[in-house]
């Protein structure tokens, strides 16, 4: 995929678009971390609600601006820019969805003692892993390191299976209601999937984007 980004890395091309995309990923991680901290700690979600929603609005505005810039970029550059524009148009949706999941998690945090201590202990490391993956996804997108990207996708696949296993165990537990824990873990799984989609752009052809083994954010 490296060749597709050459016209964006040109100072007269779309460096500002790449910076905008990186900002979306960074903001998504920030909102996700705030929401996870609120629900795991049992703290008052109102304390971070404004920041989470403002961050999500910033993500949305960047997505809209980036779409407009991609249209202009493709119009100026012609057909040679179409593959790059299609690719980045897809990836910005992955970045945008992370803010939505952060809001979903924060909504669950409104309920008192929504997670048991046991659930918190299982969810915390999975959420930390997903957050770390968001940061690494941005760096891999920049470096276009194919070997590191392939290793990342294997790791992402493992985290998603870990989330699925936890959800299966909670659903099979007839003695307790684990519905909130299942939802939070599902959101974590999808955040990891969106990070994987971004990284898949390093190693997958455009037509196979989002179809890396076990990957994806919303289709599963």
Spans of features found by a protein language model:
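Cytosolic, long alpha-helical scaffolding segments
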Residues: 1-220
């Amino acid at each position: 995929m490296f060749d597709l980004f050459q016209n964006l890395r040109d100072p007269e091309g779309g460096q500002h678009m790449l910076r905008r995309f990186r900002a979306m990923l960074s903001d998504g991680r920030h909102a996700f971390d705030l929401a996870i901290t609120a629900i795991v700690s049992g703290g008052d979600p109102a304390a971070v609600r404004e920041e989470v929603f403002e961050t999500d609005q910033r993500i949305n505005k960047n997505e809209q601006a980036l779409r407009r810039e991609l249209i202009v970029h493709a119009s100026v550059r012609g057909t040679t820019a179409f593959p790059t524009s299609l690719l980045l148009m897809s990836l910005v949706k992955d970045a945008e969805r992370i803010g939505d999941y952060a809001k979903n998690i924060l909504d669950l945090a409104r309920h008192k003692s929504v997670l048991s201590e046991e659930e918190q202990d299982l969810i915390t490391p999975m959420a930390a892993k997903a957050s770390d993956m968001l940061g690494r996804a941005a760096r891999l997108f920049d470096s276009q390191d194919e070997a590191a990207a392939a290793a990342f996708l294997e790791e992402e696949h493992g985290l998603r299976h870990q989330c699925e296993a936890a959800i299966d165990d909670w659903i099979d537990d007839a003695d307790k209601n684990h519905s909130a824990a299942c939802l939070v873990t599902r959101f974590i799984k999808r955040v990891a999937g969106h990070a994987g989609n971004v990284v898949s752009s390093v190693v997958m052809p455009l037509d196979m984007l989002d179809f890396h083994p076990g990957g994806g954010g919303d289709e599963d």
